[in-house]
From Swiss-Prot:
It comes from the Bacteria. Its cofactor is pyruvate. This is Aspartate 1-decarboxylase. Binds 1 pyruvoyl group covalently per subunit. GO terms for cellular component: cytosol. Catalyzes the pyruvoyl-dependent decarboxylation of aspartate to produce beta-alanine. It is found in: Cytoplasm. GO terms for molecular function: aspartate 1-decarboxylase activity. Keywords: Autocatalytic cleavage, Cytoplasm, Decarboxylase, Lyase, Pantothenate biosynthesis, Pyruvate, Schiff base, Zymogen. Coiled coil: none annotated. The keyword Translocase does not apply.
Length: 126
């Protein structure tokens, strides 16, 4: 059996660019791609915290250290500069891989400053 699991997440990143007339994709600071394990051209899901939009695109590399999140092409209709987004990548894992799987999560502070990283989401309490 295989399961689709969260592979990586950038939590509360701010959109820095929304470029309608650009080949579709989402440009992400190359340092964050490396740290999260998201690969260039990998399918990603983007969840817009500010307007509720959810959409699929693929990641491309932005300049290392740029703090860039650029939503491009038709997806630029779904996010504007300043919107806070969650960017997720998922992968298929075998039963054997599930035993040791831990997602890589990057948590962003205002201004796209990396706050911290984690491999687990805290248990939600009432």
């Amino acid at each position: 059996m295989h399961a689709i699991m969260l592979k990586a997440k950038l939590h509360r990143a701010e959109v820095t660019h929304a470029v309608l007339d650009y080949e579709g994709s989402c440009a992400i600071d190359g340092d964050w791609l490396d740290l999260s394990g998201i690969r260039e051209y990998e399918q990603i899901q983007i969840y817009n915290i500010d307007n509720g939009e959810r959409f699929t695109t693929y990641a491309i590399r932005a300049e290392n250290g740029s703090k860039m999140i650029s939503v491009n092409g038709a997806a630029a209709h779904k996010a504007k500069v300043g919107d806070r987004v969650i960017i997720c990548a998922y992968a298929h894992y075998s039963e054997a891989e599930l035993a040791s799987h831990k997602p890589r999560m990057l948590y962003m502070a205002p201004g796209n400053q990396l706050s911290h990283t984690s491999e687990a989401i805290p248990i939600q309490v009432a």
